[in-house]
Amino acid sequence: MSTKEIKETPLMKQYNEIKRKYPDACLLFRVGDFYETFGDDAVRASKILGITLTKRGAGSPTETALAGFPHHSINTYLPKLVKAGLRVAICDQLEDPKMTKTIVKRGVTELVTPGVSMNDEVLNSKTNNFLASIYFGKKIIGVSFLDVSTGEFLTSEGNEEYIDKLLQNFSPSEILVPKQNKGDFKEKFGDNFHAFYLEDWVYKEDYATETLTNHFQTNSLKGFGIEELASGIIASGAILYYLSETQHNKIQHITSIHRIAEDAYVWMDRFTIRNLELYHSYNPNAVTLLDIIDKTLSPMGGRMLKRWLALPLKNATIIKSRHEVVAYFKDHQEILQKVQNQIKQISDLERLISKVAAGRISPREIIYLKESLDAIIPIKELALKSPQEAVKVIGDSLHSCDLLREKIKTTLNQEAPVAISKGNAIAAGIHPELDELRGISALGKEYLEGIEKRESEKTGISSLKISFNNVFGYYIEVRNTHKDKVPTEWIRKQTLVNAERYITEELKEYETKILGAEEKIQQIENQLFEQLVSWIATYIKPVQLNANLIAQLDCLISFTQLAIDNKYVCPQINDSFALDIKNGRHPVIEKQLPIGVPYIANDVYLDRDTQQLIMITGPNMSGKSAILRQTALIVLLAQMGSFVPAESVQMGIVDKIFTRVGASDNISMGESTFMVEMNETASILNNISDRSLVLLDEIGRGTSTYDGVSIAWAIAEFLHENPAQPKTLFATHYHELNEMTESLPRIQNYNVSVKELKDTVLFIRKLVKGGSAHSFGIHVAKMAGMPQIVLQKAEKILKKLEKNHSAEALSGTKGNKDDIQLSIFNLDDPLLEEIKEEILNLDINTLTPVEALMKLNEIKRMLSKK
């Protein structure tokens, strides 16, 4: 963001010097009671904020654009600038203007960026605001994520695909990238992220290690389990450097850094995350899985639930433990309600204690902190009495913070103000001098009321009143109708339209006493409040621990409420490779159906021995895609620790979920539907394991029929013959694939049943054994309102195609799976079919040369019209 240099007053000289240090930020420059922006910054700010754009020095050579707003409105305007993608440098007055005869000293006190903010208006309570950092190593990429508002700090490293998955899951608001890798970043991860490019020297291992160990006050990083993640360490060091550069130096709430262990969680590539619409959708109005399952009652719980959804577990012991807690609360709903009522009273503990660390917490927010800690005590007591071991462990681990709660209770007034400057935050009895000064202030105000009453009676001016303003302090206001009654010793200070204002010696004397007391009161309150905040900061770790435990409990209780509301059942996790779902339902679709319309549940059974790949045929709109998605979502929910929408589920752990559901063109990157489809499918085929779940829908539909059939056949065969033998659901409209069961024993044919009535079809949406012989595409077109003439033509062409296309021509010689022969005449163009009919109907023995030439010319004309 370039700003034309302005050579003028000392103020503008000071502005220019500061602006040069932050050329790419919008500089909010404090001038008196306003934050001002100048030049290009002013033009941008006025557009984004809808504030007036004026000129400073209008008509002079130093004329520049100017836009500003009152300093007390910063929490209204700052979020709008940040959400517009701007980096905002807040430049404050660093000294009291009354105490200096020269220009006030100013400096940037905070640089707020999309990924670095503690402003509640910028943040979303149930969503982390992650700042990410990327380091491109020789073979692997390091990544780090930090939410400065909660203190969560995570790192990992891996190949491009893994890092891409993490970026999709964590959705950082801003990503730090080395300048030398600007092109690499855009090439590998696209340009949908808000990136900021740092100098390359920041990304050095020695510098990063030193930065991290200095922050955590340790000799090494072994205790965090990340010492071998060289690329992850480098990325993490860059994040701490960036915090320092943005003037975020009070970060003692960042107490640890955790490794994201790739092998601990279910693998889902970005295609799967997108296709299943877990928490994002290309359609802004679509309902996601998170929208349905989030019954959390606290901000911490909401953020943790999203993390659990992004990173489902593979550890059967932990999964079963979560299921047991859900079952316990489901069976003890009286206790469930008591815990829910307490969690509702808990504020955002993570972000409150982070504000304590940064010194940005208000008196009222400290009261919220205390009330939240109070609400934890009954939860701790209930949990300790529980016969359920995991619940008891949570109760045992919760910190009662008795001293902290008592300290806040005795130090602050229960009705503490939103800002310390508002006064009356500190409770009585804490500081003798403060109590004395408050007494003077209160008595002084009573005395002023006495003066008002006395002077009113003495002068006979009943409407006389004593007021105060910042210009000339306390004054007596008299309406013009009583002006003639004013005593001569009163001193006139101001004339208004309907009144005049006066001061007296007595008023000035008491004003000095009162204002002196109030100024001293403010100083003492500020001092005591700062001491309290520093003392609370010693409790950062216990409060963060409580926040984490309450978040876990909130997630598990959310699962319980979900199960109660929607009749979910506990999945049985075993050591097998099988997946056995009885009457499974789609958790999102079933909630979108009109009242009274039941969701048609379906069974799905997959294993590696008898039914490894289910080939599902059926028309469009019949529900094939829903069955595929619901299978994946049931597995995901189970491995998050939730109950599932089914009659029963027995399953072995799934370690990877792959989906290719529906076509989604990546036009902006110049890729066709078919190319995108092949890229996604290649990702699956290159990463499958023996515990993978593969869901393929309409593979090959982005190309011609024969290419499509060939590719779909080859992929299905590859999955069947692969040593991993991954469990697979394969939905297709290529009915020719039903013939694969004759040569590939672990493939079974199913179809989504359709009832064919006289001239319409009824979608039953039930998965039944056996292949489907028709696609009912013309029926679907009719339901969509296709013109009758088009439908009639389609029927005619369909009959002709069905007459001439044999199954053997498509599947090749039966039983020969290695050599699929496609007949040269089985072309999917109706015109070519018509020409073929013309040629086959010719009687060559009776055809004259002229007739032959005429027929050839006719065929040529037909082709030239094509």
Swiss-Prot record:
Keywords: ATP-binding, DNA damage, DNA repair, DNA-binding, Nucleotide-binding. PROSITE patterns: DNA_MISMATCH_REPAIR_2. ATP binds at residues 618-625. GO terms for molecular function: ATP binding; ATP-dependent DNA damage sensor activity; damaged DNA binding; mismatched DNA binding. GO terms for biological process: mismatch repair. The keyword ATP-binding applies. GO terms for cellular component: cytosol. InterPro entries: DNA_mismatch_repair_MutS, DNA_mismatch_repair_MutS-lik_N, DNA_mismatch_repair_MutS/MSH, DNA_mismatch_repair_MutS_C, DNA_mismatch_repair_MutS_clamp, DNA_mismatch_repair_MutS_core, DNA_mismatch_repair_MutS_N, DNA_mismatch_repair_MutS_sf. It comes from the Bacteria. Belongs to the DNA mismatch repair MutS family. This protein is involved in the repair of mismatches in DNA. It is possible that it carries out the mismatch recognition step. This protein has a weak ATPase activity. This is DNA mismatch repair protein MutS. The lineage of its organism: Bacteria, Pseudomonadati, Bacteroidota, Flavobacteriia, Flavobacteriales.
